[in-house]
Amino acid sequence: MDVSFQATLPKGYALEENSLFGIYATCTRAEKVNTNMAENSGIAKYSFTEEAIPYLYKSAEGEAVVGKKGDHNYKFYAFYPYDASVTDLSAIPVNIPATIDWKADDTPDLTMLLAAQATVTSIIAPVPMTFEAVAQCRLTIRIPNTTVPVIKSLKVAPVKESVFKGQLAWSGTYDIFEGKATSNESSGSKSITVNFGSGYTLPEGYTEISFVMGEFKYPSGGLQLQITKGDGTTITKKMFEASEVFAAGSSKVYTLS
């Protein structure tokens, strides 16, 4: 029997049809524990659909997770986005860049690593999987062209970086079995900068600049936005209230006034 999955995504997180997930599945089979259930004997590649319910199904022949009579003690681990180079689920790469080069014609990469696991005694398809974002959140900054006709850069950072113990940007790994993210010691940054080259002329109305950040607690002294305009002058604004929580999977919007 090919195993399918019902995918519950984080609130507000949308995916395109046929987005790819990785599924690692084991069971006890013929008294052998932790037997890999994938047809490819590795990590199965599953497709996402939302035709009726959010649902994961095998993406191609040979990519299914297969259950057999007598199997038991099932363990399922799933992650998004699928990456063929990921073979060790105790070290899934995570990368949140500290510097972003923004291009008006490109769709910003707002992908957050999603992960889920489930342990069941029997299979009643589809197997429910509840996904959570891994140590990442999204921030959207809305900028009016009446305030900033041309933008060269924007920077988000704590007002008092010296007392901020978190990291807005970092690279590292995520262990899906332990549910733990680990950053590389030298990779952390307390700020994120978006560059617009020699300057980008904002169209009429509001322009939304969105990017991914690491989850963090609101820093002592606050969080600030610094925008450098085309003429070299800067605007600095304090963002959000001290009670704001930037939890994994959350999306925040700040509108420059």
Please give the residue ranges for each predicted region.
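Short, low-hydrophobicity acidic/polar segments
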Residues: 1-150, 196-209, 229, 239, ...
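Contiguous ligand/interfacial binding patches
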Residues: 153-218, 222-246
